[in-house]
Amino acid sequence: MTLARFALALLFGVLPEVVGFESVLNDSLHHRHRHSPPPGLLYPHYLPTEQRHRRTRPPPPLPRFPRPPRALPALRPHALQAGHTPEPHPRGCPAGEPWVSVTDFGAPCLRWAEVPPSLERSSPAGWAQLRGQRHNFCRSPDGAGRPWCFYGDARGKVDWGYCDCRHGSVRLRGSKNEFEGTVEVYANGVWGTVCSSHWDDSDASVICHQLQLGGKGIAKQTPFSGLGLIPVYWSNVRCRGDEENILLCEKDIWQGGVCPQKMAAAVMCSFSHGPAFPIIRLVGGSSVHEGRVELYHAGQWGTICDDQWDDADAEVICRQLSLSGIAKAWHQAYFGEGSGPVMLDEVRCTGNELSIEQCPKSSWGEHNCGHKEDAGVSCTPLTDGVIRLAGGKGSHEGRLEVYYSGQWGTVCDDGWTELNTYVVCRQLGFKYGKQASANHFEESAGPIWLDDVSCSGKETRFLQCSRRQWGRHDCSHREDVGIACYPGSEGHRLSLGFPVRLMDGENKKEGRVEVFINGQWGTICDDGWTDKDAAVICRQLGYKGPARARTMAYFGEGKGPIHVDNVKCTGNERSLADCIKQDIGRHNCRHSEDAGVICDYFGKKASGNSNKESLSSVCGLRLLHRRQKRIIGGKNSLRGGWPWQVSLRLKSSHRDGRLLCGATLLSSCWVLTAAHCFKRYGNSTRNYAVRVGDYHTLVPEEFEEEIGVQEIVIHREYRPDSSDYDIALVRLQGPEEQCARFNSHVLPACLPLWRERPQKTASNCYITGWGDTGQAYSRTLQQAAIHLLPKRFCEERYKGRFTGRMLCAGNLHEHKHVDSCQGDSGGPLMCERPGESWVVYGVTSWGYGCGVKDSPGVYTKVSAFVPWIKSVTKL
């Protein structure tokens, strides 16, 4: 087998390349684990001496200025098969290969902006376009020679060297579009492929990331039978998924034989947020985390004009590319000018979107820009040494913080100078700035990382300044450095960080707060949740009115992770991200503590005398029931949707008395309930209180009011050992008709006519209360549709216990088990008179079990007791 492989390779002239490449890989992997050389290409200086000298040529002595390298003859292609001829050395490095930043003998390239001025003064004309560029990609400015770059030699001097831009490149072949195909790797002048053993989505994602075709790859396989004769370089590739190129992944050198199932590795590149979002990439930066923004639309790549471009737009781009960290917008073709069409203009993201497609913007292709206005972004990863300004009104001002060892910390102002400020602002993309008192910004609770910082003003990075060791200082947070950088004419909006949304509210201005982090929507725990936190959420969503916080899963329990706990906003922040003081995902909560907000909240409006009189003269009005259509059947009701619903509670000095029964408000001072509610604790008025206007039993609300009990009247025919005559009236404390104050959330129900038969006159019936939901008793007021049934159903089921003073109601369908358990004992069964008002026809009384098939609920028939009710209440 070995002899056959050797003969076959010799026949096609590929033996030196394939064998040499395996030697490079083996040697590179060996040194990578022992000496950890810089990541990147397989550096030839790790080869044996004779191989290194045979394959490379040492650079010439450093001239007074770098000469543009001469073009070398193209290497003779080794034909593997028809249609598979390796390409000669390219004259430039394509945008799809941004990781090529070393010479062909392994020296890392310098950034073009870091070339000493002494060389720049005498530079060739063809090189002028590269001055000031922040990237270090190999280039051929005159277009005639092999790509080259500057590098620093062992003596600290600047030299130049050629690059092989194809070495280590990848491409996708065998598909009709550029987003999928068989993976091929270029090495030693020959394109080869990868065995599909252990090939998964993490490996595929690295390929897609390397080709700038999206942040998510799907692993595929291709039969070798359709590839022809092509070398196999690797098997068992084991990427984590966050590597910048496939060379940095662990893998095995192919030792020959047959790949499992005779399949080669292939990929399909896509985006994690779905095909509706445009495909984007970053081009021209020094790494995959920055560059000119380009979009793929209508079959071609194009750029974005920088009109209105700011950090909020950059936040969305970074999120769509699945790049975390600090997002920053760049203007005026900072990463070089593009060459395709200008696709978009006037992009105005809030920073809360998941894709640029969701942002306000011009129509595709409409603009008034040239490529000198191409927009760029940087998505700076949170690595040691990253800086930010926090606690201010925008990203241009605040307390200086440095990221180190997984935590943000501050800088002490001992010896702080204007040069230090200049270096910080320049690194953050501003031209200049000034020191500001840290007292103007919220005090940090984190560590103090740096002290005695001294910059010369020439540094490009803050950490290049002299300083003490990390964590060594003699300061307090009163000495934290504060800085205000000048945004200039371009303007900079604060990056809004994590997207937020409101869920399960009655309208778009309220709901459970959910935040999008790490690709998943999750909730916020209500520990310490206040109106100040709510104000920041509403501001981030664009609402300017008053905000109110809601706790205890006021809008229902969410699903998924609880992302954030112990939010501490001052109320002045622009986004939730500025208020998070605790690690993401760290909490001690359940979803029963999910936080919510109400935006543009204008509270309880005072009613004039004329309005009070009009409300007291009518009954059965639901002023809020038409605000939104809801699915009825054991679901949360609308706040204020059942304004006559009240609760009978055990009296407590802490206003947390236990709910005993539901009840129905008949007037300002009289409440209707069930007699059995007083069996356990007696009829002493000192034991009870009535709460009106309530919705969430654990959250104090603006319309609710707790009123003492003045009198309890139980029907004289009621016996504790019987369910007949199960009706009672409660007189509230207060002057006549001035006990409960009427408003949109507190109104009386209507009484039926004496001996009225609701089965013939009523429709659209509901029960309400804080009753059994199937798992526990509800914290929020529930409502469920229910049907009035012929009395024979209950007479057959309950025999002699069912009397003519009772109503039979429920749902007999197997999939609709709604009965009296969904309401509360003593609570109302309400029906609507067609074209008129709402009438209390029943009082929740008794039944056999909860939600049991063929066991309808039994309700006291109010129409049978109208004379008694009127005689007691004088209504």
Swiss-Prot record:
One of its GO terms (biological process) is proteolysis. Keywords: Disulfide bond, Glycoprotein, Hydrolase, Kringle, Protease, Repeat, Secreted, Serine protease, Signal. Residues 631-874 form the Peptidase S1 domain. It holds the Pfam family SRCR. The gene is PRSS12. GO terms for molecular function: serine-type endopeptidase activity. Residues 58-71 have a biased composition (Pro residues). It is found in: Secreted. Residues 1-20 form the signal peptide. It comes from the Eukaryota. InterPro entries: Kringle, Kringle-like, Kringle_CS, Kringle_sf, Peptidase_S1_PA, Peptidase_S1_PA_chymotrypsin, Peptidase_S1A, SRCR. This is Neurotrypsin. The lineage of its organism: Eukaryota, Metazoa, Chordata, Craniata, Vertebrata. SUPFAM superfamilies: Kringle-like, SRCR-like, Trypsin-like serine proteases. Its EC number is 3.4.21.-.
